[in-house]
């Protein structure tokens, strides 16, 4: 819980209930008393997302958000990002994983630091509930 509240501590605006809501939105409210080493890699990744959510961002930059996750946790993280997008946040995902890339509405391919091409597509898989 304190991990999620870190930004609040910096701004002297501690709100435990808001942090619990952020954890609930990523499916981890029941794990709020666990230390980081007591969480799986997927749970730790979702705590990072909850920490970002507490600031109510309109833009989220997710650098390899599913790196080193199993398929189940990868799907959970992608679904969380989809829900954030559907609620009005702009999500920019940086990834080398083509499986993750196909989830995007728009894909920008870079080669040697320059835009090589851009593709638009429709989302094909259903959203899972956390």
Go through each PLM region and give its residues:
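Conserved catalytic loops of ABC-family nucleotide-binding domains
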Residues: 80-93
